[in-house]
């Protein structure tokens, strides 16, 4: 399927005819294509094998991805928070990436207490359609789960994180969270937001809640439900010892090996890039994720991508996404539903010789590297890619298709 984020960038919305001659009853059979005849430009289409050596830097990203499997879903806290917030749900491997969501001044607290890994999830009661949230215009929630070396480090970090953030404004007032005497929280009575931290074992749960009005009771209730929902999930997580971070595998089920890399023969290593680090805690930061394979739960928490069940797992390289379904039947069903939403006015030429594909124009800034996008199906896999021009994305998509075929 095409992700909501991909749809937002590509602006898709009506119908396109089926391009390949697949069997209509039972298991679809991929059409045979002469791969050597495809125009792949300079893009490689030979499968790669994941490197067997890693390091602590990449391992922190991979451990953060693992933490995504025990994150709460914002709808567990507030059933209205059904929409994702673009680029606000992601692994947080470093204090820098976490500070991008919290506040730059909090970074020192995370560093001094040895933050190891983390994950963030966000939700909204309004479909923001790729736009940044506006405080007061909707209900919003961001929850961070941060891992520290031990219980003491987590307790000290939770206290310092709250104190540092609260000190940014003299109008901040301490708040108590019922049922959690060890929690730290604050808010400004004239602003409809509240921030809170709570240490549980070697983890810190950080919550940033926003409402449509400065209602302390509503906000404290939201924070309390965050802790209620998140704490039980932590018992299911078995943390990797920090000294073993570099042993975590760089790929899962060959997913990254099947996703077109940014350069021929260049493995995309796990990376998270934070932009627009905010002085104050808020919703202006953006996190871009590269070279990771998300597990089933983290995949479904990435609501801004709009993944559709019965998706299993996804590989992500920023705007390029590879999705795996249980079988070819379910993959085709989701793919067809997505392309039935395509607006014919947005269509551009698809790569010659590639079956089951459609391409569209992108509504983006002329300086953006994402000027066109394609969505292609092969077997139980679908891939969505972007490019800096129609010709570029057509070649990339042809290479992606060939890579999927050759990967089996």
Can you say where each PLM-predicted feature lies in the sequence?
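Short, intrinsically disordered low-complexity segments
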Residues: 40-42, 67-94, 183, 187-204, ...
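C-terminal motif of bacterial Sec signal peptides marking the signal peptidase cleavage site
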Residues: 18-21
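Bacterial N-terminal signal peptides that target proteins for export
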Residues: 1-10
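N-terminal "mature-domain start" segment
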Residues: 23-133, 220, 226-227, 231-315, ...
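A short acidic-to-branched-hydrophobic micro-motif
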Residues: 117-156, 302-337
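Long compositionally biased, domain-poor regions of proteins
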Residues: 193-199, 203-208, 212-213, 293-407
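Short Gly/Thr-rich strand-loop-strand
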Residues: 92-113, 123, 137-140, 150-197, ...
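Hydrophobic, ordered structural segments
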Residues: 26, 146-149, 161-162, 195-249
């Amino acid at each position: 399927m095409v992700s909501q984020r991909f749809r937002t960038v590509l602006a898709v919305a009506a119908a396109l005819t089926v391009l390949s001659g697949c069997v209509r009853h039972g298991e679809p059979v991929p059409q045979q294509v002469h791969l050597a005849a495809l125009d792949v430009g300079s893009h490689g289409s030979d499968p790669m094998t994941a490197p067997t050596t890693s390091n602590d830097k990449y391992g922190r990203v991979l451990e953060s991805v693992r933490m995504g499997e025990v994150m709460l879903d914002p709808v567990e806290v507030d059933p209205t928070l059904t929409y994702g917030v673009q680029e606000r749900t992601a692994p947080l491997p470093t204090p820098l990436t976490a500070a991008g969501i919290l506040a730059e001044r909090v970074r020192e607290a995370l560093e001094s207490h040895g933050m190891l890994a983390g994950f963030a999830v966000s939700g909204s009661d309004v479909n923001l359609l790729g736009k940044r949230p506006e405080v007061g215009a909707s209900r919003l929630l961001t929850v961070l789960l941060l891992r520290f070396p031990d219980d003491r480090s987590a307790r000290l970090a939770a206290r310092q994180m709250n104190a540092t953030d609260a000190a940014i404004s003299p109008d901040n007032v301490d708040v108590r969270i019922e049922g959690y005497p060890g929690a730290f929280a604050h808010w400004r009575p004239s602003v409809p937001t509240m921030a809170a931290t709570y240490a549980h074992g070697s983890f810190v749960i950080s919550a940033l809640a926003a409402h449509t009005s400065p209602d302390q009771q509503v906000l404290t209730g939201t924070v309390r439900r965050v802790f209620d929902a998140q704490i039980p999930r932590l018992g299911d997580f078995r943390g990797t010892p920090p000294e073993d971070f570099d042993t975590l595998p760089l790929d899962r089920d060959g997913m990254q090996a099947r996703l077109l890399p940014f350069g021929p023969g260049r493995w995309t290593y796990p990376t998270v890039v934070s932009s627009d680090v905010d002085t104050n805690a808020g919703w202006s930061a953006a996190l871009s994720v590269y070279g990771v394979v998300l597990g089933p739960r983290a995949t479904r928490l990435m609501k801004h991508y709009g993944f559709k069940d019965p998706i299993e797992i996804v590989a992500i390289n920023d705007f390029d996404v590879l999705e795996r379904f249980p079988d070819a039947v379910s993959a085709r069903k989701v793919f067809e539903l997505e392309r039935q939403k395509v607006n014919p006015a947005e269509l551009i030429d698809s790569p010659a010789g590639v079956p089951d594909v459609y391409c569209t124009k992108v509504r983006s800034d002329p300086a953006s590297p994402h000027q066109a996008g394609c969505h292609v199906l092969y077997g139980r896999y679908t891939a969505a890619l972007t490019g800096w021009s129609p010709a570029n994305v057509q070649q990339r998509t042809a290479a992606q298709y060939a890579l999927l075929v050759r990967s089996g």
